[in-house]
Design a protein with these regions (language model features):
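Membrane-embedded alpha-helical bundles of multi-pass transporters/translocases
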Residues: 1-579
C-alpha cells in the first residue's frame, strides 16, 4: 500500500475510531434515556434509521457514483473552482428537494418500515420528521468531504462526526437531567421539547458535521459561491453510472425490508408456533446488535481504506495510467483481506466475550442470541469488505453496470435464502440464517465479480498475487479458528465464567479478560501461519503501522514506507498539512 494511501487510511481510521467511541457513549446515554425496549426506544430507532436509508439510496446513486469521480476530474481543469461550485450547488439543490419531499412523505415511510402499535407509529412519525433534515446534511458532508479527500485533506473530514456525537450526547444528557428515564412514560409525555432534545439535537449534530467542512474547504483555496448550471461539469457521461448505482441501492433496500420484517416477526412466530417466550428468541434487536458489531471493523478499516484509495485510483484512471491503478487496487485488496480475515476469525471464535464487553448492560442469555448471527456474519466479512474497494474502482471507470450485476445476484441470494428459511426452518433459526445468507451471498458470486473487474484492466488485475494472498490468509484464518475454538471453553473456565447452550454467567471483567486471552491465541496462530507461509502483506501492514504509530517503530530515513514488494516508496506527507 502506498505511503499516501496508508497515511490517509490511518487518518480516516483514527477519526472513525474516535467517532465509534463517542458514538458508543451516545448509545449508552440513549439507552439510559429511552431504554432498549418499549415503544419509545423502538420509535426512536426507526425515526433515526429512515432518513439514513433514504440517504443511502441517494449516496449510492448520485454522490458516490457520479460526483466523486467528477470532483477528481474537475480538480485537474483550469476553471476548477467554477466547476466545483456548480457541483456543490447542484448537490445542495437536489438534497433540499429530496429532503422536503421525504418530509411530506414521512407518514407513508413510517408505515413501510415500522410494524407496531399505534403509539409506536405516532411517535416514530414525529421522530422521523425531526430527523429528516439529516438527509440534506449527510449529502453535503459527502460532497464536501470528497473534495477534501481528493485534495489529500482528511483530518476534519475524518473527525467531524465526533462533534456530531458530542452534540447528541449533550442533548441526551440534558434530557436525562430534566426528565429522567422515559422508558415507561405514556405517549402524551412526548412533547415537542422532549422530541427536540433527542431527535432534534442529533440532527443538529449532523448539521455541524457537514457545515464545519467549509472551514478546511476555504483553506485549500476554494471559496464556495452558489453557481447554478450543469454545463461543462461532465455529468452527462455519468448518467448511466447513476442509474445503475441507484438500482444497486434500490435492490438492497428491498432486501433490507425483507430482513427487517422477517427479523421482527421471528419472536412472535416462535411464540405462536412453538409456545416460547418472545424474550428467548432472537429477533430484530438481536440481529441489529450483531450487525452493528460486525460493522465496526468494516467501517473502521474497509471504509477508511476505500475512501483513501478511491481518489488515487480515480486519478490514475483519469490519467490513463492503468498500471498505477492496478498496483493500487492490488495492494489495497491484499492488505485489506489480511486485516479483515483476522476480524472474521475473532467473530467466529469469541463473539460472546466481544458482545458482553461492548454491551455490558445485557445478560448472557441475550448475548448468546446475538453471538450466533454475529459469527455467521463474520464468515463473509473479508469478501464483503473487498467488494467495497472493487465497487469504487468500477465507479472510477464510470462503470455502474457491473457492480449492479454483482449486487443483483447477491441480493437475490440473500432474499431467496431468507424467505425460504421462513418455510423450512423454525423461527428460532431465522436470525442466524439472515447472517449466513449475507455471508454466502458475497462468497458465491465473488469469482464473477473479479472476472468482470479483469476486463477493465486488460485481462489482468494482478491475479496471481491476489489469489496467493487470499489463499494464505484463508489458511491462517482456518488455523486460528480451529485452535481458538479448541481453547475457548478452557479460557472461559480459567476466568471463572460458565457458559451453557442457552444461558450462563460471565460478568464484564470476565468478558474483557476472555476477549483479550482468546484474541492473543488467535493472533499468535494467525500471524505465525502468515509468517510460515511468507505472506508479503504481513510485512506491508505491520510496517505501515509501525512507521506511523508512536512506540511501534521509526519511519525509514528516506521518508518512505515499505511496499508489498519490499521497495521503498517516497512519502508524500511533506506535501502539505492535512486539514
Amino acid at each position: 500500500m502506498s505511503s499516501s494511501v496508508g497515511r490517509n487510511s490511518l487518518i480516516m481510521a483514527s477519526g472513525t475510531a474516535a467517532s465509534r467511541v463517542t458514538g458508543q457513549i451516545r448509545t449508552i446515554l440513549l439507552a439510559w434515556a429511552l431504554g432498549t425496549t418499549g415503544y419509545a426506544a423502538n420509535a426512536y430507532q426507526a425515526g433515526s434509521m429512515i432518513p439514513q436509508v433514504i440517504y443511502t439510496l441517494v449516496s449510492g446513486g448520485i454522490f458516490n457514483a457520479v460526483l466523486v469521480p467528477q470532483i477528481v476530474r474537475t480538480l485537474k481543469s483550469k476553471d476548477a473552482e467554477t466547476k466545483l461550485n456548480k457541483l456543490i450547488t447542484l448537490a445542495i439543490t437536489l438534497l433540499l428537494g429530496l429532503t422536503l419531499l421525504m418530509a411530506v412523505a414521512t407518514p407513508l415511510l413510517t408505515k413501510l418500515y415500522v410494524n407496531g402499535s399505534a403509539e409506536t407509529m405516532a411517535l416514530a412519525t414525529s421522530f422521523t420528521l425531526w430527523c429528516m433534515p439529516q438527509i440534506f446534511f449527510y449529502g453535503l458532508y459527502t460532497v464536501i468531504g470528497q473534495i477534501l479527500a481528493a485534495k489529500d485533506h482528511f483530518v476534519t473530514y475524518a473527525w467531524s462526526s465526533v462533534g456530531a456525537n458530542i452534540i447528541s450526547c449533550i442533548g441526551f444528557g440534558a434530557f436525562i437531567a430534566m426528565f429522567g428515564r422515559a422508558t415507561e412514560r405514556p405517549l402524551d409525555f412526548w412533547t415537542p421539547t422532549k422530541i427536540a432534545l433527542t431527535a432534534g439535537t442529533w440532527t443538529l449534530g449532523v448539521a455541524f458535521q457537514a457545515l464545519v467542512l467549509f472551514i478546511p474547504l476555504t483553506r485549500i483555496g476554494l471559496k464556495y459561491r452558489p453557481k447554478f448550471g450543469v454545463h461543462g461539469i461532465g455529468l452527462r457521461s455519468m448518467g448511466p453510472v447513476a442509474a445503475w448505482s441507484l438500482g444497486i441501492v434500490g435492490v438492497d433496500q428491498i432486501v433490507n425490508i425483507i430482513v427487517t420484517r422477517v427479523a421482527t416477526s421471528a419472536p412472535f412466530k416462535a411464540s405462536e408456533q412453538l409456545h416460547m417466550s418472545q424474550l428467548d428468541v432472537a429477533g430484530n434487536a438481536s440481529y441489529q446488535n450483531a450487525y452493528t458489531i460486525y460493522m465496526l471493523p468494516y467501517s473502521l478499516i474497509a471504509v477508511s481504506i476505500a475512501t483513501a484509495i478511491f481518489p488515487k485510483i480515480s486519478k490514475a484512471i483519469a490519467d490513463r495510467n492503468i498500471d498505477e491503478a492496478r498496483k493500487d487496487l492490488s495492494s489495497a485488496l491484499r492488505n485489506l483481506n489480511l486485516i479483515m480475515c483476522f476480524f472474521a476469525a475473532a467473530f467466529i471464535v469469541l463473539p460472546l466475550p466481544i458482545i458482553l464487553a461492548l454491551l455490558p448492560s445485557i445478560s448472557v442469555r441475550e448475548a448468546l442470541l446475538i453471538s450466533t448471527p454475529l459469527a455467521a456474519l463474520g464468515i463473509g466479512l473479508p469478501l464483503s469488505s473487498s467488494y467495497l474497494v472493487i465497487q469504487r474502482t468500477f465507479y472510477a471507470f464510470e462503470d455502474g453496470k457491473h457492480p449492479f450485476i454483482f449486487m443483483a445476484i447477491t441480493m437475490t441470494i440473500q432474499g431467496g435464502v431468507i424467505i425460504a428459511s421462513t418455510f423450512i426452518l423454525p423461527p428460532t433459526q431465522w436470525i442466524t440464517v439472515i447472517g449466513l445468507a449475507i455471508s454466502v451471498s458475497f462468497i458465491l458470486p465473488y469469482p464473477l465479480l473479479t472476472h468482470m473487474l479483469r476486463s477493465r484492466f486488460d485481462g489482468d488485475v494482478d491475479d496471481k498475487r491476489i489469489i496467493t494472498a487470499y489463499a494464505k490468509a484463508l489458511v491462517a484464518t482456518i488455523a486460528a479458528c480451529v485452535i481458538g475454538l479448541l481453547c475457548r471453553n478452557g479460557v472461559y473456565r480459567l476466568v471463572g465464567a460458565h457458559i451453557g447452550p442457552d444461558d450462563g454467567t460471565m460478568n464484564w471483567g470476565q468478558a474483557v479478560l476472555s476477549a483479550i486471552l482468546l484474541t492473543i491465541v488467535i493472533a499468535i496462530v494467525y500471524l505465525a501461519c502468515l509468517w510460515a507461509l511468507r505472506a508479503e502483506e504481513l510485512t506491508s501492514v505491520v510496517g505501515m503501522l509501525a512507521a506511523r504509530i508512536p512506540g511501534l517503530g521509526n519511519k525509514p530515513k528516506s521518508g518512505g514506507t515499505a511496499s508489498p514488494n519490499g521497495k521503498l516508496e517516497q512519502s508524500t506527507a511533506e506535501n502539505g498539512d492535512q486539514e
